[in-house]
């Protein structure tokens, strides 16, 4: 099972949140789980890292596989965005991760479960 870890959990981990560290440890020890992140969410973490965090950030991200954004994912994300933005205020990045999980059968681990209201997407609150 692909475990897509949302950027919020990655950032919490980098900022020293013990609950985020426990979640990542649990997922990495689960033989049925593969650590993944979406390309856009990886970019969010890399683009906004603090200079002092660079080594730790790149080390953390090296444990994850990164799913590319394909035309099919973008098209599905557009449909999610148009459907869910007016009522739930989801942003483009969240729509792309939801479409990525839908396309690959993955689960999304996040603290922001309200960003993923799609009924057919498996979303798990990190802690």
PLM segments and residue spans:
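Short active-site oxyanion
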Residues: 1, 31-35, 63-65, 102-107
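Short, well-structured N-terminal submotif of metal-dependent ribonuclease cores
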Residues: 1-37, 46-59
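Alpha-helix capping/helix-boundary segments
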Residues: 9-10, 41, 73, 96-97, ...
